[in-house]
Amino acid sequence: MAAAAAAGPEMVRGQVFDVGPRYTNLSYIGEGAYGMVCSAYDNLNKVRVAIKKISPFEHQTYCQRTLREIKILLRFRHENIIGINDIIRAPTIEQMKDVYIVQDLMETDLYKLLKTQHLSNDHICYFLYQILRGLKYIHSANVLHRDLKPSNLLLNTTCDLKICDFGLARVADPDHDHTGFLTEYVATRWYRAPEIMLNSKGYTKSIDIWSVGCILAEMLSNRPIFPGKHYLDQLNHILGILGSPSQEDLNCIINLKARNYLLSLPHKNKVPWNRLFPNADSKALDLLDKMLTFNPHKRIEVEQALAHPYLEQYYDPSDEPIAEAPFKFDMELDDLPKEKLKELIFEETARFQPGYRS
């Protein structure tokens, strides 16, 4: 062990990866939003793992996302949600420039898979079931993921699926309009529910269901269903398929400017799903219709989606666990300076330090 440690940190593509002596034989996988991901050999458990290097401390937003992700993933425990196996960082806060998060190694993700393969109905059904099974747990903890998209769904060779990237996640709070909530909302536009763009009051779990609907549509056709180039284009893509919203649906849009914009548009008819996806299973299209519903109050919820006939071969409520307790952030992270967030990240990762006692 001492000899390995003395060899110093490994370099990957010009970046220091200081994870020895336990983790060796590093191999580049890709770049994350603010760090590199490598696979490595875990000499303790004798398996290959994924290690994400994060260097967030220069930016308040990156610190926030890192802390959210670590806090949530250390409390969640579910087969369809990526866990954290280990966290490596410097022994003192002054020395801590990077954080290394060790997770199970998953060979690919749904984004990469859909670029190269057309999925069978069986695969679509099984992947969708696992997404919803993981989402049931997330929502039972009163958390919104808020950034569900194909690249955040990790897959391995046995078709196990795990949801990752909780950096944008929030505690669900339907009564509270987060100040600045929209401004920092940077989730990928193509998977955003219409109410996010229309500034409806309070976001609910239904925003994640919309994203899952977009993902299902993409699995059926290997292309994004609403590939908007910008904010208004995104809305036009959605209305071009769903048709013009009814008066009842317009009433849930609080923002008058947004409502008037919708009223000013020429009337559009809904495009039948079987015209868009002529080869798709009719039950899959029925579930898709219930997920991609303009009005968030009429959108299907995760438990109902799991019980839908399309998923009946997998549906088993006794094997679809929920969180033991609702998740809470001790404080609103938005307003904290990066120095305070760094302290909180240091504390949150202490349990992985050698000789730690709680």
UniProtKB/Swiss-Prot annotation:
<keyword id="KW-0206">Cytoskeleton</keyword>
<dbReference type="GO" id="GO:0030424">
    <property type="term" value="C:axon"/>
</dbReference>
<keyword id="KW-0963">Cytoplasm</keyword>
<dbReference type="GO" id="GO:0060020">
    <property type="term" value="P:Bergmann glial cell differentiation"/>
</dbReference>
<feature type="domain" description="Protein kinase">
    <location>
        <begin position="23"/>
        <end position="311"/>
    </location>
</feature>
<dbReference type="GO" id="GO:0005901">
    <property type="term" value="C:caveola"/>
</dbReference>
<dbReference type="Pfam" id="PF00069">
    <property type="entry name" value="Pkinase"/>
</dbReference>
<dbReference type="GO" id="GO:0008286">
    <property type="term" value="P:insulin receptor signaling pathway"/>
</dbReference>
<dbReference type="GO" id="GO:0019858">
    <property type="term" value="P:cytosine metabolic process"/>
</dbReference>
<dbReference type="GO" id="GO:0005856">
    <property type="term" value="C:cytoskeleton"/>
</dbReference>
<feature type="modified residue" description="Phosphoserine">
    <location>
        <position position="246"/>
    </location>
</feature>
<dbReference type="InterPro" id="IPR017441">
    <property type="entry name" value="Protein_kinase_ATP_BS"/>
</dbReference>
<dbReference type="GO" id="GO:0008284">
    <property type="term" value="P:positive regulation of cell population proliferation"/>
</dbReference>
<dbReference type="GO" id="GO:0014044">
    <property type="term" value="P:Schwann cell development"/>
</dbReference>
<dbReference type="GO" id="GO:0004674">
    <property type="term" value="F:protein serine/threonine kinase activity"/>
</dbReference>
<dbReference type="GO" id="GO:0032355">
    <property type="term" value="P:response to estradiol"/>
</dbReference>
<dbReference type="GO" id="GO:0005654">
    <property type="term" value="C:nucleoplasm"/>
</dbReference>
<dbReference type="GO" id="GO:0031663">
    <property type="term" value="P:lipopolysaccharide-mediated signaling pathway"/>
</dbReference>
<dbReference type="GO" id="GO:0046697">
    <property type="term" value="P:decidualization"/>
</dbReference>
<dbReference type="GO" id="GO:0071320">
    <property type="term" value="P:cellular response to cAMP"/>
</dbReference>
<dbReference type="GO" id="GO:0106310">
    <property type="term" value="F:protein serine kinase activity"/>
</dbReference>
<dbReference type="GO" id="GO:0015966">
    <property type="term" value="P:diadenosine tetraphosphate biosynthetic process"/>
</dbReference>
<dbReference type="GO" id="GO:0003690">
    <property type="term" value="F:double-stranded DNA binding"/>
</dbReference>
<dbReference type="GO" id="GO:0050853">
    <property type="term" value="P:B cell receptor signaling pathway"/>
</dbReference>
<comment type="similarity">
    <text>Belongs to the protein kinase superfamily. CMGC Ser/Thr protein kinase family. MAP kinase subfamily.</text>
</comment>
<dbReference type="GO" id="GO:2000641">
    <property type="term" value="P:regulation of early endosome to late endosome transport"/>
</dbReference>
<protein>
    <recommendedName>
        <fullName>Mitogen-activated protein kinase 1</fullName>
        <ecNumber>2.7.11.24</ecNumber>
    </recommendedName>
</protein>
<feature type="short sequence motif" description="TXY">
    <location>
        <begin position="183"/>
        <end position="185"/>
    </location>
</feature>
<keyword id="KW-0547">Nucleotide-binding</keyword>
<keyword id="KW-0832">Ubl conjugation</keyword>
<dbReference type="GO" id="GO:0005829">
    <property type="term" value="C:cytosol"/>
</dbReference>
<dbReference type="GO" id="GO:0032206">
    <property type="term" value="P:positive regulation of telomere maintenance"/>
</dbReference>
<dbReference type="GO" id="GO:0032496">
    <property type="term" value="P:response to lipopolysaccharide"/>
</dbReference>
<dbReference type="GO" id="GO:0005769">
    <property type="term" value="C:early endosome"/>
</dbReference>
<dbReference type="GO" id="GO:0061431">
    <property type="term" value="P:cellular response to methionine"/>
</dbReference>
<dbReference type="GO" id="GO:0042220">
    <property type="term" value="P:response to cocaine"/>
</dbReference>
<dbReference type="GO" id="GO:0060291">
    <property type="term" value="P:long-term synaptic potentiation"/>
</dbReference>
<feature type="modified residue" description="Phosphoserine">
    <location>
        <position position="244"/>
    </location>
</feature>
<keyword id="KW-0472">Membrane</keyword>
<dbReference type="GO" id="GO:0050852">
    <property type="term" value="P:T cell receptor signaling pathway"/>
</dbReference>
<dbReference type="GO" id="GO:0060324">
    <property type="term" value="P:face development"/>
</dbReference>
<dbReference type="GO" id="GO:0042473">
    <property type="term" value="P:outer ear morphogenesis"/>
</dbReference>
